[in-house]
């Protein structure tokens, strides 16, 4: 019974979300990406040949944690387009008024959450967006502001306002091309 309810809910979400088809050409038009949220040089201390022992060193982990707290102040007030995944934090039914945008599916559901400079608050309280499948990628367009905020599940280093949210859908053609490229 529970599985039928979950299946019906996922079908409802899929039918009620808007999608754009992602092709290689579309991906190349995205000027903004997750690394732009990191200030220049924040992670320069990481060697290219990082070993497991070095990675597990407490001093290295402390530096990594500090680097994740550094924000890119040059982004203040700029328009941004960023793909990622929705983690709802304020919602009523299927209307989401605030959510965290994270780079990978399932982040914030487990510990530790992504770094501060990789977590964005998306505020759609003026016009709530519909809840999407948490494992389905979205793209958020909007204006970014720099500044941290704390929530029960994670902290955010940035806020996106005036947001437009679209669900991403990869075309069969793009998937076939990727499979062929990987088999060469």
Task: Pin down the residues of each PLM region.
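N-terminal signal peptide c-region/cleavage motif recognized by signal peptidases
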Residues: 14-16
